[in-house]
């Protein structure tokens, strides 16, 4: 563990990540850098849309772990722990990095979200000596977000002081890391849940969202009216909607009607 900040300028940090051509390689690089400032495990997740239509936290499309048991995937995905995790509750409400401690007597930001409903999360982390850490929320321009979390095992009383000393370094590291990681995301990582609309279904729904009838859409895309209706009905069914209007609302909420960019956001030039 170093006594002095270890991070260089943004360009140097970015080059350390982009030297690796795979997502896992860049995650490994982030973990190595995190270990130098005192962290012992890494959690990295990305969620294309923060909330579902009922206001519940969405399960992320990507969850990557380093030095953490793989059973966390099962608990956070299949058992829904991600939805009730107090750390995620805070991450959705702030853009600043924060220290957390699952000890109910600790005065950290997650404390007000800890209750009987979140007890399974507290128990899981406590049983694995993962009760303290720092999380960096990364909120992106279109509403999607990621969190980069560093964990320290055990209950070292000095860890909070140490973590807060290096929290600015970790914040910079996490943001530059996510920028380079995001550029390697595939379609699955950027998609919400299991809903997959074809390009033609998206096109028809997009025109429907603009107020066009099936007959008008048929002229715009140069296809027959029955073909347009078929695509709209297929999209409505995939979205679990009762009618075309609800299908448009759901598709818009889950960002399924957005044009998919063929390029990545330009890097920061700082």
What are these regions (language model features)?
Residues 138-149:
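Short hydrophobic/glycine-rich mini-motifs in sensory/regulatory modules
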